[in-house]
């Protein structure tokens, strides 16, 4: 079983450039309250734009598309999904909304990841939602001649629940030790994608 040790790996990330960037980010975050209240309408507008762009990009990378008008209506929850693609987009919209509105109350734990994945597919009727992968998967590519080759071999299906528990534990241990979340999150996301825990929807979940 792979080992996940964020507290040790974090030390290698503390380059002068990264430390400088972290300092600036936290400095600007401390100043943002000066701009939030007088610009609340503009910030709300920017948030809606960000949701639309995130939904479009995250779904398109997995080949899930619809027209621009339909996408905007779906993200704004002003229409019902008609096709399978639109049902998956609507599920992503709801998961994104859940995270935006409740992120402070969503712990990084296996059962919560499964719940969010189930919500991702709640409009589709597909049985893959809310379950870890049942078969091994690979990250493969096909060259111009049609030859398929394996780029990456994720964790095997039978090891997946334990691997996810381990990365969640590593994340929480590092967070409880006071390590900056901006350092922990990219390590967690990379490990999540390397585990590739679901039969479908790994990119959108990350």
Predicted regions and their residues:
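FIC/Doc superfamily catalytic core
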Residues: 1-206
């Amino acid at each position: 079983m792979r080992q996940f040790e964020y507290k040790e790996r974090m030390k290698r990330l503390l380059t002068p450039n990264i430390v400088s960037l972290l300092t600036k980010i936290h400095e600007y975050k401390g100043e943002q309250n000066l701009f939030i209240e007088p610009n609340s309408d503009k910030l709300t507008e920017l948030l809606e734009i960000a949701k639309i762009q995130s939904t479009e990009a995250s779904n398109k990378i997995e080949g899930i598309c619809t027209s621009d008008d339909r996408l905007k209506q779906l993200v704004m929850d002003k229409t019902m999904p008609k096709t399978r693609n639109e049902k998956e987009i609507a599920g992503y919209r709801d998961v994104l909304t859940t995270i935006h509105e409740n992120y402070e109350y969503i712990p990084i734990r296996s059962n919560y990841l499964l719940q969010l994945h189930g919500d991702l597919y709640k409009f589709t009727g597909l049985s893959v939602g809310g379950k870890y992968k049942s078969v091994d998967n690979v990250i493969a590519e096909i060259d111009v001649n049609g030859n398929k080759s394996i780029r990456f071999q994720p964790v095997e299906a039978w090891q997946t629940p334990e691997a996810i528990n381990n990365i969640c534990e590593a994340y929480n241990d590092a967070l409880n030790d006071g390590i900056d979340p901006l350092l922990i999150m990219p390590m967690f996301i990379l490990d999540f994608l390397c585990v590739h825990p679901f039969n479908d929807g790994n990119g959108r979940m990350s």
